[in-house]
């Protein structure tokens, strides 16, 4: 019987994993979704206590200090130190407790700022990351370094996945820390519901930055399905990119249009070019993933945004904001 511990299990991806596992009801696996209330993973003793209590054979490591572009830009040291602590505590404790496999979640932001496109798994360490979020990026890169070190010294199959921009139900909508899609959903909902005295055609929704940067997005449920596949079937320490196909890349302005459509918003969209764009593009190749799963069908962006907006409206009172 596998015992799977999910760190960061109450967040965006953890909730998606929980939903998929509930539907699958695997008879040979027990899953425990740990949140911050279960253990402070920056504390080694607390991490060890969690592992001793749950006795996992496998770990999906999602726990991290995370945030959007502007939160990262202002707090690089905190992102570096907290994530280094979390990752080292989880990986070392997993090893000490004899965990067979750990799948850690990285991010496409770890790739070099100056690079050729599309980026792939071989390019992680080819140069410094974008300066806007170097603290988070270097901490995440070191997971890959540690995975190789545990394999070299102990033969551990501790690996990592690199998703593109994740979104979906149970996201963090707090405007101070949110990523682009939940941030837009939060602000669009405010605009639509709180300014009822203003005719909708006169309302203006502001897109931060030029709207031109290109991004690939992955719906949290799709990522959950793929991470479960990695846990059960992918037997390499080398990272694997879990990203939608390159042809599904869209501009930030197109994302804003999709969010507006989901809210039936008929006002204007304007770009505030005084705000930073971050990296212009981060196009990732999913060729390795496609070599294993050539027929996997990603949820299209409009369908996924519609579902995310619907969840936010229906769960507004308990949504993280």
Swiss-Prot record:
InterPro entries, alphabetized: Epimerase_deHydtase (IPR001509), GDP_fucose/colitose_synth (IPR028614), NAD(P)-bd_dom_sf (IPR036291)
Site positions (Important for catalytic activity): 107, 109
Residues that coordinate or bind substrate: 187, 215, 277
Catalytic activity: GDP-beta-L-fucose + NADP(+) = GDP-4-dehydro-alpha-D-rhamnose + NADPH + H(+)
Keywords: Isomerase, Multifunctional enzyme, NADP, Oxidoreductase
GO biological process, one term: 'de novo' GDP-L-fucose biosynthetic process
Stated family: Belongs to the NAD(P)-dependent epimerase/dehydratase family. Fucose synthase subfamily.
Protein name: Probable GDP-L-fucose synthase
């Amino acid at each position: 019987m596998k015992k799977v511990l999910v760190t960061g299990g109450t967040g965006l991806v953890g909730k998606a994993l929980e939903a998929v596992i509930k539907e699958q009801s695997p008879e040979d696996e027990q899953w425990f979704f740990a949140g911050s209330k279960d253990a402070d993973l920056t504390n080694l003793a607390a991490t060890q206590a969690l592992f001793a209590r749950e006795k996992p054979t496998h770990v999906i490591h999602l726990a991290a200090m995370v945030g959007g572009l502007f939160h990262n830009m202002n707090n690089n040291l905190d992102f570096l130190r907290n994530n280094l602590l979390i990752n080292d505590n989880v990986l070392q404790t997993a090893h000490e407790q004899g965990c067979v496999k750990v799948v850690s979640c990285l991010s496409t932001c770890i790739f070099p700022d100056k690079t050729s496109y599309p980026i792939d798994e071989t390019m992680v360490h080819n140069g410094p990351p974008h300066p806007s979020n170097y603290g988070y990026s270097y901490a995440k890169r070191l997971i890959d370094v540690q995975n190789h070190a545990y394999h070299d010294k102990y033969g551990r199959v501790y690996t990592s996945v690199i998703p593109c921009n994740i979104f979906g139900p149970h996201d963090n909508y707090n405007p101070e820390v949110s990523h682009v899609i939940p941030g837009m959903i939060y602000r669009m909902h405010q605009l639509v519901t709180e300014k009822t005295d203003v005719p909708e055609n006169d309302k203006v929704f502001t897109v931060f930055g030029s709207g031109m940067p290109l991004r690939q997005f992955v719906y949290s449920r799709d990522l959950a399905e793929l991470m479960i596949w990695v846990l059960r079937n992918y037997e390499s320490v080398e990272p694997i990119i879990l990203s939608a196909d390159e042809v599904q890349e869209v501009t930030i302005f197109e994302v804003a249009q999709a969010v507006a459509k989901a809210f039936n918003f008929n006002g204007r969209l304007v770009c505030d070019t005084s705000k930073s764009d971050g990296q212009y593009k981060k196009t990732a190749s999913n060729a390795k993933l496609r070599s294993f799963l050539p027929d996997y069908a990603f949820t299209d962006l409009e369908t996924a945004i519609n579902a995310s907006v619907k969840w936010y409206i229906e769960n507004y009172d308990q949504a993280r904001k």
